[in-house]
């Protein structure tokens, strides 16, 4: 081969190889951004219920409210988000009116639903300025209200969300969003709620998606970053995003401060990780796609627009993606059952029912994804709080047999032989989180009827040793029991041998798809081959040309 030809082919191979290498890296980053490799660590209040619903109940006709709550429960929803306005409950400094809040809370409890209560909207006597959602002039006024609320309803309420959309001017009473002022409000309110209800879980306000960086609106990720810089992290337990899909579906994997899409939640998650707060979950206080009916004559949607069939499909696909890829995501509250808005308001495009109360396709999609009986990638405690006043019990999908006991510590093996646990998971691996100590006991584990492939075996099967290595020192550890499984559904069976009174089983972690599937490895190999061949041809061609 002539040197000039060899050099030309070398340059071509080298260029193509580098191009493929760059494209492969970009595709890998986009495809796996936001995922967790290996076994996800314990993150409280993540996982199921993955799907909730926003309801606007305050001031609603009581019969309509009770009917709506029952219909929502029949869809399989167990957790709802509801706004209770400070302005209506404390209209004057020394005047309290709990009557409507009492009715709302009683109806929610009667329907068997768990509320996430959103507190906000200053009364005129306390407001910094006149207008909806105006912040208080003195944060301590709001904190005193929140403490009174928690003292009154703390036995019924676990989750409290402090304000809504403080990063927008409409969420801050028409004023300029002020992270420092919100941080002060959050600190005072969180401390007051926790003083009245030590078990309270505090949610950061839902941060609205916007690409603006001031002065009137501040990007969600930037507002969150400033809260961390202001030292507000100890005042909240959960971050809340609003990953509306706008005009693209849940598989739009662009993660960009200038792009509004479902993947925008990853931007906020990356801020949390950057500030060392990855041990907390991210929830979605609002999300969804807007589908106004054909012939709509009201105001246009500012959230993009899809048709009803696409809306329903996107809801299903979004939940599937979250369960498969985002183990850090907790409950996502779909917007909404029905808006508290006139009939020409575009928020009706999010509604699960039409103005006549008929279910829309989105409601059926919600029903299809509401119950997560299969454990998807993420961490799951062995026991979770049950209905108010009934302690702890198994998470949905876990089938315990025998004399197991449940508490905040996990699941405790009974004294009699025969305690078993079965569940189905979707993923590529399983790890058990166990409490080892100075006792002799084992858990025998099989996956799809075969001994778990990461455990030692004896005649009975694959076993996990519950005795701590030095016998005397108790420890809680996550032990991989099965890895390298094909991604899909797998059935686990666990049998306990001894170990009562030790609360041995703390939880389990499901591994998802790894960030290196075959087709990307192939592309990487071809690109490296092209680079290598191109480099060799180029060098040998140059050597020949000099002779």
Task: Give each language-model segment a name.
Residues 17, 369-546:
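Glycan-recognition surfaces in beta-rich domains, encompassing non-catalytic CBMs
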Residues 75-216, 246, 289-294:
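Substrate-binding cleft and catalytic face of glycoside hydrolase catalytic domains
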Residues 49-55, 80-82, 115-119, 160-162, ...:
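Hydrophobic faces of well-ordered beta-strands that scaffold small-molecule active sites
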Residues 143, 177-309, 352:
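Noncatalytic carbohydrate-binding groove/subsite architecture in carbohydrate-active enzymes
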Residues 59-74, 141-150, 217-229, 312-321:
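Short, acidic/polar
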Residues 4-11, 19-79, 91, 106-110, ...:
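N-terminal carbohydrate-binding accessory modules
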Residues 11-22, 26, 30, 37, ...:
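Aromatic-rich peripheral "rim/lid" segments of glycoside hydrolase catalytic domains that contact
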């Amino acid at each position: 081969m002539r040197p000039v030809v060899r050099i030309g082919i070398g340059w071509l191979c080298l260029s193509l190889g580098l191009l493929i290498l760059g494209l492969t890296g970009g595709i890998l980053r986009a495809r796996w951004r936001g995922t967790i490799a290996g076994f996800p660590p314990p993150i409280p209040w993540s996982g199921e219920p993955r799907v909730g619903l926003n309801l606007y109940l305050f001031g609603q006709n009581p019969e309509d409210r009770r009917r709506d709550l029952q219909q929502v429960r029949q869809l399989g929803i167990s957790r709802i988000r509801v706004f209770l306005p400070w302005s209506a409950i404390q209209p004057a400094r020394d005047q309290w009116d709990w009557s409507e809040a009492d009715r709302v809370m009683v109806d929610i409890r009667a329907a068997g639903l768990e509320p996430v209560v959103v507190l906000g909207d200053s009364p005129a006597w306390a407001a910094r300025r006149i207008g909806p959602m105006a912040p208080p002039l003195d944060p301590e006024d709001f904190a005193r209200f929140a403490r009174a609320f928690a003292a009154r309803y703390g036995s019924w309420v676990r989750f409290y969300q402090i304000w809504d959309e403080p990063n927008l001017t409409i969420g801050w009473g028409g004023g300029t969003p002020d992270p420092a002022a919100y941080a002060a409000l959050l600190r005072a309110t969180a401390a007051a709620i926790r003083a009245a209800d030590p078990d309270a879980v505090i949610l950061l306000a839902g941060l609205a998606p916007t690409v603006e960086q001031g002065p009137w609106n501040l990007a969600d990720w930037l507002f969150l970053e400033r809260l961390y810089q202001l030292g507000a992290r100890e005042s909240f337990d959960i971050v809340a995003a609003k990953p509306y899909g706008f005009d693209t579906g849940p598989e739009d994997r662009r993660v960009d401060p200038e792009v509004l899409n479902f993947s925008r939640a990853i931007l906020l998650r990356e801020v949390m990780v950057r500030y060392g707060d990855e041990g907390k979950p991210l929830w979605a206080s609002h999300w969804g796609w807007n589908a106004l009916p054909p012939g709509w004559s009201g105001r246009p949607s500012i959230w993009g627009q899809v048709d009803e069939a696409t809306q329903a499909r996107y809801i299903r696909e979004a939940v599937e993606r979250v369960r498969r890829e985002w183990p850090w995501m907790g409950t996502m509250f779909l917007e909404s059952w029905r808006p508290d808005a006139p009939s020409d308001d575009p928020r009706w495009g999010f509604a699960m029912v039409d103005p006549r109360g008929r279910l829309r396709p989105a409601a059926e999609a919600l029903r299809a994804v509401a119950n997560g009986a299969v454990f998807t990638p993420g961490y799951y405690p062995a026991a979770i709080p049950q209905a108010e006043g009934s302690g702890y019990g198994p998470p949905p999908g876990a089938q315990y047999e025998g004399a197991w006991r449940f508490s905040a510590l996990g699941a405790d093996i009974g004294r009699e032989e025969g305690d078993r646990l079965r569940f189905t998971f979707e993923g590529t691996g399983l790890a058990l989180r166990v409490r080892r100590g100075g006792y002799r006991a084992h858990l025998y584990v099989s996956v799809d009827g075969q001994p778990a492939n990461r455990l030692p075996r004896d005649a009975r099967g694959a076993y996990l040793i519950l005795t701590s290595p030095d016998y005397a020192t108790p420890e809680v550890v996550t032990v991989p029991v099965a890895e390298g499984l094909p991604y899909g559904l797998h059935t686990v069976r666990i049998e306990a041998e001894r170990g009562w009174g030790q609360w041995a089983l703390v939880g389990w972690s499901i591994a998802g798809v790894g960030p290196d599937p075959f087709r990307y490895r192939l592309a990487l190999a071809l690109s490296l081959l092209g680079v290598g061949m191109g480099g060799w041809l180029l060098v040998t061609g140059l050597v020949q040309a000099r002779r």
